[in-house]
């Protein structure tokens, strides 16, 4: 039959029918082809960026201290061993914060979560324990001033280092070995995957160590005041000079202890009273100051030390400034 004789029973224009047929064919074809869903955009929490930045600063600062102490054979006294332990712990803490950011957004898995939280717990525990060990060492160096540099003191320092790192590693292994809340979210603390009980143990341990440090620093203040008074009498210093020296020593100790408490106390108390149901912004707001303590530690304990300052100057410019070479240690340098 001739095409011109075909009857259009629908009464619609032929162009419209051709277009409708094309749309039907296109719809049928597209229904057989699976739709490609767009990949979800990676949304990064600004708090995680701040924590990662903090971890980077921590790592850079403390890496310098570790390298100075490791490469300088003269820095092998008990005090420098403990400062090196503190710097190494803070260095690992900074690395833990960086790896936590990388694994959270690039390599998400249960294994990476457990390894990262284990590293962070172990390193921060070692950092706090090293601060306590430094406080003990300072107390012993003042209380047993005549016998402090004996072989017995070096042995005691190594025993403290083994104990504090052994305890810290054990605390870090607890989440990895199974004490976590990955299978039961109701037991989670403010920091997943730590359990509420695990966080409580860490918080109570911190409060106990803080109480010990407070007691030791009170005793150190008494010894410093007594030594400063004796030096003033021997050298016929004025009373105002004795007062200024004592005040500097007490102020230094107050700054050290106050900084430590201000950094760690908010997160410690929050971990005791809160759980996983609380908004995460509170966890970030209290955890971030705790990381600042690892940024401040090298300034307080390492870069203020004369010997480390000399070693750093030798590395950077190959000479020791006359102000460092001639500076005498005073009772306020505690």
Swiss-Prot record:
Organism in which the protein naturally occurs: Homo sapiens (Human)
Lipid anchor positions (S-palmitoyl cysteine): 317
Name of the featured protein: G-protein coupled receptor 12
Origin organism lineage: Eukaryota, Metazoa, Chordata, Craniata, Vertebrata
CDD domains noted in UniProt: 7tmA_GPR12
PANTHER family found in the cross-reference section: G-PROTEIN COUPLED RECEPTOR
Residues in the Cytoplasmic compartment per record: 70-77, 135-158, 221-252, 304-334
UniProt xrefs under InterPro entries: GPCR_Rhodpsn (IPR000276), GPCR_Rhodpsn_7TM (IPR017452), GPR12 (IPR000599), GPR_3/6/12_orphan (IPR000723)
Glycosylation sites: 8, 24
Major location category of this protein: membrane
Homology family: Belongs to the G-protein coupled receptor 1 family.
Subcellular location field: Cell membrane
């Amino acid at each position: 039959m001739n095409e011109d004789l075909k009857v259009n029973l629908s009464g619609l224009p032929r162009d419209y029918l051709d277009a409708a047929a094309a749309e039907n064919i296109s719809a049928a074809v597209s229904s057989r082809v699976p739709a490609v869903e767009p990949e979800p955009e990676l949304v990064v929490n600004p708090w995680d960026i701040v924590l990662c930045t903090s971890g980077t600063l921590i790592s850079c600062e403390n890496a310098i201290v570790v390298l100075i102490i490791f490469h300088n054979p003269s820095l092998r006294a008990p005090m420098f061993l403990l400062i090196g332990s503190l710097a190494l712990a803070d260095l690992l803490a900074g690395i833990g914060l960086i790896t936590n950011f990388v694994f959270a957004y690039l390599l998400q898995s249960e294994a990476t979560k457990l390894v990262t939280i284990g590293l962070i717990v172990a390193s921060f525990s070692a950092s706090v324990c090293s601060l306590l060990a430094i406080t003990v060492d300072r107390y012993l160096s003042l209380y047993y001033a005549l016998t402090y540099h004996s072989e017995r003191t070096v042995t005691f320092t190594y025993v403290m280092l083994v104990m504090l790192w052994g305890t810290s590693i054990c605390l870090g292994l607890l989440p990895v070995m199974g004490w976590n809340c990955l299978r039961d979210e109701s037991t989670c603390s403010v920091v997943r995957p730590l359990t509420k009980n695990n966080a409580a143990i860490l918080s109570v341990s911190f409060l106990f160590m803080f109480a010990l440090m407070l007691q030791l620093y009170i005793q150190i203040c008494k010894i410093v005041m007594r030594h400063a008074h004796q030096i003033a009498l021997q050298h016929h210093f004025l009373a105002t000079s004795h007062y200024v020296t004592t005040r500097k020593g007490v102020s230094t100790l107050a700054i050290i202890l106050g900084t430590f408490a201000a950094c760690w106390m908010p997160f410690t108390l929050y971990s005791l009273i809160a759980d996983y149901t609380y908004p995460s912004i509170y966890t970030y707001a209290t955890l971030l100051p705790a990381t600042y303590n690892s940024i401040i530690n090298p300034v307080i304990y390492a870069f203020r030390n004369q010997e480390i300052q000399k070693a750093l100057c030798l590395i950077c410019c190959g000479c020791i400034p006359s102000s460092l070479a001639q500076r005498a240690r005073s009772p306020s340098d505690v």
